[in-house]
A protein has these predicted regions:
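Short S/T/G/P-rich N-terminal loop/turn motif that feeds into the first structured element of a domain
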Residues: 1-51, 58-69, 78-94
């Protein structure tokens, strides 16, 4: 298994509720449809506006393909910018 670790800057999104609604109604359902998706976790942004997600995929290839859609500098929704996107092998799970 491999995971995509993504960090976003949400400081351009003035209404956190709009961002949360888009996350729940668009981003998460779309992630579930990506090839090889196994699980995903999206963490609320900190006070500095940085949000983090971890999406787990069955293969490195599927994780890399998903990460390409969330490249640094891209904007998954208005007011949100990807600042970090990494693919890593999963070392352990519980």
């Amino acid at each position: 298994m491999h995971a995509v670790l993504t960090e976003v800057d949400t400081s351009g999104q003035p209404d956190p509720q709009v961002g949360l609604k888009a996350l729940q109604e668009q981003i998460v359902p779309n992630a579930r449809q990506t090839p090889g998706f196994q699980a995903g976790y999206w963490l609320r942004p900190l006070e500095d506006g940085k949000g983090t997600s971890l999406a787990v995929y069955d293969t490195e290839e599927n994780a890399k393909a998903a990460a390409e859609a969330l490249s640094v500098g891209s904007s998954p929704m208005p007011g949100v910018t990807v600042v970090r996107s990494e693919v890593r092998a999963v070392a352990a799970s519980a």
